[in-house]
């Protein structure tokens, strides 16, 4: 079972965090 990662907020910080998490395969972005 993969972890679910929720990015709170929008803008560069949220986008960067989501991209980093997705590229590192940390879990599903929800």
Swiss-Prot record:
It is an enzyme of class 1 (oxidoreductase). Keywords: NAD, Oxidoreductase, Tricarboxylic acid cycle. The lineage of its organism: Bacteria, Bacillati, Bacillota, Clostridia, Eubacteriales. Its EC number is 1.1.1.37. One of its GO terms (molecular function) is L-malate dehydrogenase (NAD+) activity. InterPro entries: NAD(P)-bd_dom_sf (IPR036291). It comes from Heliomicrobium gestii (Heliobacterium gestii). Catalyzes the reversible oxidation of malate to oxaloacetate. The keyword Oxidoreductase applies. It comes from the Bacteria. NAD(+) binds at residues 9-14. One of its GO terms (biological process) is tricarboxylic acid cycle. Belongs to the LDH/MDH superfamily. MDH type 3 family. This is Malate dehydrogenase. SUPFAM superfamilies: NAD(P)-binding Rossmann-fold domains. Disulfide bonds: none annotated. It catalyses: (S)-malate + NAD(+) = oxaloacetate + NADH + H(+).
